[in-house]
UniProtKB/Swiss-Prot annotation:
This is Hemagglutinin. Belongs to the influenza viruses hemagglutinin family. Palmitoylated. In natural infection, inactive HA is matured into HA1 and HA2 outside the cell by one or more trypsin-like, arginine-specific endoprotease secreted by the bronchial epithelial cells. One identified protease that may be involved in this process is secreted in lungs by club cells. It comes from Influenza A virus (strain A/Chicken/Weybridge H7N7) (Influenza A virus (strain A/FPV/Weybridge H7N7)). A lipid is attached at residues 559, 562 (S-palmitoyl cysteine). SUPFAM superfamilies: Influenza hemagglutinin (stalk), Viral protein domain. The record marks 342-343 as: Cleavage. Glycans are attached at residues 30, 46, 141, 249, 424, 496. Major glycoprotein, comprises over 80% of the envelope proteins present in virus particle. The extent of infection into host organism is determined by HA. Influenza viruses bud from the apical surface of polarized epithelial cells (e.g. bronchial epithelial cells) into lumen of lungs and are therefore usually pneumotropic. The reason is that HA is cleaved by tryptase clara which is restricted to lungs. However, HAs of H5 and H7 pantropic avian viruses subtypes can be cleaved by furin and subtilisin-type enzymes, allowing the virus to grow in other organs than lungs. Residues 19-529 are extracellular. Coiled coil: none annotated. It comes from the Viruses.
Length: 563
């Protein structure tokens, strides 16, 4: 007997096309990437540059009292060489030193000149008053061909004191000046180092020369050093200029017996200004608050990569050429329509990391499908909430950096006056520290922005979930399948947070009962397939055994057991 058994399997697929509402955000692939505390190169929807790299190649002086010193060096405004005659007294908001400006005419130098230069740069100008010194028995009109006006002359604010006649003895003298003003006085004097001992004797008589200067806070003695030196401006002698700040009601006393360049007037600094060294053109038609040797930086950004020596109200210098500040959420392209496998938190992680192309009205938005079709709309409330928190982020960053950098600048100002060129190393160290700090601050703000965007999306998602309750089911992709008919007005009520779940509750329950028994989530499909396969095998085995049993019973089959 030949028996053939045919087994057919019937698979029924029940498809539901439920109304659905989804949550997402606007994306626009633009390649804008920022760094956060935990990740580098995170693509975001929007970002703002925080490092300025361009400037105006002019000194913008509109609205400022500008003093362009031209051939005059800034220190020369105190002593008065011929090239500085028009700048002996002035008022300024902006002082411009040129590279070919000169502080002296008779060769020499200012001791601690850079510290004095810093003081003058920050002053708003200079006025002067006579010190009232009178002399007898000596000449006070020493001149030199190195300081020429109509002929040989000397520093306008100094007196070159000489013996009454050549080679005559120079008498011992003492002169004092008391500062009777409320503000400190700047006092400058000089020590003349002759080109030879013979020249010194001719000018001041024979014997050793000594100059002593003292006040309540200052005391110093100076011995001139005659000797042969290379000629500068036709002179082999040198004048060293020294200075001190004389407090109000304090007195300075000079004691000398030759080789002394005496001050004629005391200088008083007034107000505040900015001083820069630059050779670029001055433009009175543009405005600026930040200057450097190459021009004017006009920027509202917190950092700049143009010049570390910029002065004024400036962005702080950093080494980085770019530090992007995120002003929008993380930019993740729209996921394919084919659903991806997700973990336990897929419903949350899914929509946060999924953006929709093409929406320009807002960041956070809804998509829906129903019998009337599909639609997309922005959620302005969530969008505005995020914008309100992100707006002003750049200004807050400026406040943070300005406050910190200003403290550092103030801390090192006094050091600069005391140790001069060591400040160059200090500034380099400050740049290193604050370049790192700037990168860290921007990364922290970027992390906060991205976390904020996720937080606002979570709030929006929870708002929708609490409205729908049992009338809908999350599908793990940031969408809700709604168990009742939801027209455009219904969808609008969900978006506007005016949805009444009780109105649709009965319909939703009925539809849920019909859908749930046949709705298989992806996690159970494999289990049911294996169960079906096992049951089919068992059924085939049972049928085969039944046929064998019937055949044996009716004699159609004999079973012989051999031992």
């Amino acid at each position: 007997m030949n028996t053939q058994i045919l087994v057919f399997a019937l698979v029924a697929v029940i498809h539901t096309n439920a109304d659905k509402i989804c949550l997402g955000h606007h994306v626009s692939s633009n390649g804008t990437k920022v760094n956060t505390l935990t990740e580098r190169g995170v693509e975001v929807v929007n970002a703002t540059e925080t490092v300025e790299r361009t400037n105006i190649p002019k000194i913008c002086s509109k609205g400022k009292r500008t003093v362009d010193l031209a051939k005059c060096g800034l220190l020369g405004t105190i002593t008065g060489p011929p090239q500085c005659d028009q700048f002996l007294e002035f008022s300024a908001d902006l002082i411009i030193e040129r590279r070919d400006g000169n502080d002296v005419c008779y060769p020499g130098k200012f001791v601690n000149g850079e510290a004095l230069r810093q003081i003058l740069r920050k002053s708003g100008g200079i006025n002067k008053e006579t010190m009232g010194f009178t002399y007898s028995g000596i000449r006070t009109n020493g001149t030199t061909s190195a300081c020429r006006r109509s002929g040989s002359s000397f520093y306008a604010e100094m007196k070159w004191l000489l013996s009454d006649t050549d080679n005559a003895a120079f008498p011992q003298m003492t002169k004092s000046y008391k500062n009777t003003r409320r503000e400190p006085a700047l006092i400058v004097w000089g020590i003349h180092h002759s080109g030879s001992t013979t020249e010194q004797t001719k000018l001041y008589g024979s014997g050793n020369k000594l100059v002593t200067v003292g006040s309540s806070k200052y005391h110093q003695s100076f011995v001139p050093s005659p000797g042969t030196r290379p000629q500068v401006n036709g002179q082999s002698g040198r004048i060293d200029f020294h200075w001190l700040i004389l407090d109000s009601n304090d007195t300075v006393t000079f004691s000398f017996n030759g080789a002394f360049i005496a001050p004629d007037r005391a200088s008083f600094l007034k107000g505040k200004s900015m001083g820069i060294q630059s050779d670029v053109q001055v433009d009175a038609n543009c405005e600026g608050e930040c200057y450097h040797s190459g021009g004017t930086i006009t920027s509202s950004l917190p950092f700049q990569n143009i010049n570390s020596r910029a002065v004024g109200k400036c962005p702080r210098y950093v080494k980085q050429e770019s530090l992007l500040l995120a002003t929008g959420m993380k930019n993740v392209p729209e996921l394919p329509k084919k659903r991806r496998k997700r973990g336990l938190f897929g419903a949350i992680a899914g929509f946060i990391e999924n953006g929709w192309e093409g929406l320009v009205d807002g960041w956070y938005c809804f998509r829906h499908q129903n019998a009337q079709g599909e639609g997309t709309a922005a959620d302005y409330k969530s969008t505005q909430s995020a914008i309100d928190q992100i707006t002003g982020k750049l200004n807050r960053l400026i406040e943070k950096t300005n406050q910190q950098f200003e403290l550092i600048d103030n801390e090192f100002t006094e050091v600069e006056k005391q140790i001069g060129n060591v400040i160059n190393w200090t500034r380099d160290s400050i740049t290193e520290v604050w370049s790192y700090n700037a990168e860290l601050l921007v990364a922290m703000e970027n992390q906060h922005t991205i976390d904020l965007a996720d937080s606002e999306m979570n709030k929006l998602y929870e708002r929708v979930r609490k409205q729908l309750r049992e009338n809908a089911e999350e599908d793990g992709t940031g969408c809700f399948e709604i168990f009742h008919k939801c027209d455009d007005d219904c969808m609008a009520s969900i978006r506007n947070n005016t949805y009444d779940h009780s109105k649709y509750r009965e319909e939703a329950i009925q539809n849920r009962i019909q859908i749930d028994p046949v709705k298989l989530s992806g996690g159970y499909k494999d289990v049911i397939l294996w169960f079906s396969f096992g049951a089919s095998c068992f059924l085939l085995l049972a049928i085969a055994m039944g046929l064998v049993f019937i055949c044996v019973k009716y004699g159609n089959m004999r079973c012989t057991i051999c031992i």
